Amino acid sequence: MADIQNISLDSPGSVGAVAVPVIFALIFLLGMVGNGLVLAVLLQPGPSAWQEPRSTTDLFILNLAVADLCFILCCVPFQAAIYTLDAWLFGAFVCKTVHLLIYLTMYASSFTLAAVSLDRYLAVRHPLRSRALRTPRNARAAVGLVWLLAALFSAPYLSYYGTVRYGALELCVPAWEDARRRALDVATFAAGYLLPVAVVSLAYGRTLCFLWAAVGPAGAAAAEARRRATGRAGRAMLAVAALYALCWGPHHALILCFWYGRFAFSPATYACRLASHCLAYANSCLNPLVYSLASRHFRARFRRLWPCGRRRHRHHHRAHRALRRVQPASSGPAGYPGDARPRGWSMEPRGDALRGGGETRLTLSPRGPQ
């Protein structure tokens, strides 16, 4: 990465020295609280039989939250110090480690988003054939592979940065010569941004094309069923992937502009650099907001963290289990085998059977639109 990333142009009393700590403090607090709540939601124990098993999407979201939390905890405070202070105060080891963690977590996030997009594509395009592949065990193996690849791609950054003396000050700056730095920065853009974004775009694009490829009324009904099958989780992960592309795009564009364009050192270019970093770092605190807004399932699980939410959920599932105990096991009305009943109908006991004291007969009765 370019030298300009790690040399502050502002003095401690300037506007930048005041604004940067405030912006980074907000990113730090929101990211810690938001991703901490995501971990709490996904790691909450299953005290009863109605707790659903952890899905592959849950495991990938959990991995994203871990990567974001590591980034915010280990990187954001030190980057704020780089922008605020005139010198690097933490030594050569921390200088190398912080920048290694920045790229390690960036690669982990981008590769995880690519894995999620492929998982969603298989779930929609090949729901039956991919069932044996899309298991929690294989998802954990995929997460391990993501971190292994992230470690391999980010390993060069352990020697990329170092500390140098500049008069009486010690600075944390790139230590490689320009040719090697340019090659690594371009490789990081290609492998850590361009390739994952291309995979995500292709996977979600093919998924959407498949969902909307309906011919005739039967095809439209099948497409609608498939769209419902994707659920809000798929839309939430699509929003997360789009946010990643939008937040990290200016950061990589600025680096490429530095190497291949005209990048004069000025307050304007410094402001662009600062804005691109703030936008990239803010990506780690925006994902929990997307989950809470786009996923009704996530909000329901979040409410279970609190005593009142657990009581409501337990009461709901007790009623659901009671209904299932009286539900026929094998047949429904003509044309709706098993439990495949049309929306707007419910299983209810006939009132005359209850009044007569005889055997309860279950019939389908209209509930009205939902």
UniProtKB/Swiss-Prot annotation:
Q: Does the keyword Iron apply?
A: no
Question: Could you tell me which PROSITE patterns the record lists for this protein?
Answer: G_PROTEIN_RECEP_F1_1, G_PROTEIN_RECEP_F1_2
Topological domains, Extracellular: 1-20, 79-96, 160-184, 258-259
Quote the residue positions with lipidation, kind S-palmitoyl cysteine.
308
Disulphide bridges, residue numbers: 95-172
Keyword Disulfide bond tagged: yes
Describe its membrane topology: Multi-pass membrane protein
Q: Which residues lie on this side of the membrane: Cytoplasmic?
A: 42-57, 119-138, 206-236, 281-370
Alphabetical GO CC annotations of the entry are: cilium; non-motile cilium; plasma membrane
Q: Name one GO biological process term.
A: G protein-coupled receptor signaling pathway, coupled to cyclic nucleotide second messenger
Where on this protein are sugars attached? 6
Positions of transmembrane segments: 21-41, 58-78, 97-118, 139-159, 185-205, 237-257, 260-280
> What are this entry's molecular-function GO terms?
galanin receptor activity; peptide hormone binding
User: Which controlled-vocabulary keywords does the entry list?
Assistant: Cell membrane, Disulfide bond, G-protein coupled receptor, Glycoprotein, Lipoprotein, Membrane, Palmitate, Receptor, Transducer, Transmembrane, Transmembrane helix
User: Where do the segments described as Disordered lie?
Assistant: 317-370
Going by the entry's taxonomy, the superkingdom of the source organism is recorded as Eukaryota
Subcellular location per UniProt equals: Cell membrane
Family stated for the protein in its record = Belongs to the G-protein coupled receptor 1 family.
General function of this protein = Receptor for the hormone galanin and spexin-1.
Question: Which PANTHER family has this protein been placed in?
Answer: GALANIN RECEPTOR 3 (PTHR45695:SF33), LEUCOKININ RECEPTOR-RELATED (PTHR45695)
Its recorded name reads: Galanin receptor type 3
Q: What organism is this sequence from?
A: Rattus norvegicus
Its lineage reads: Eukaryota, Metazoa, Chordata, Craniata, Vertebrata
Question: Gene encoding this chain?
Answer: Galr3
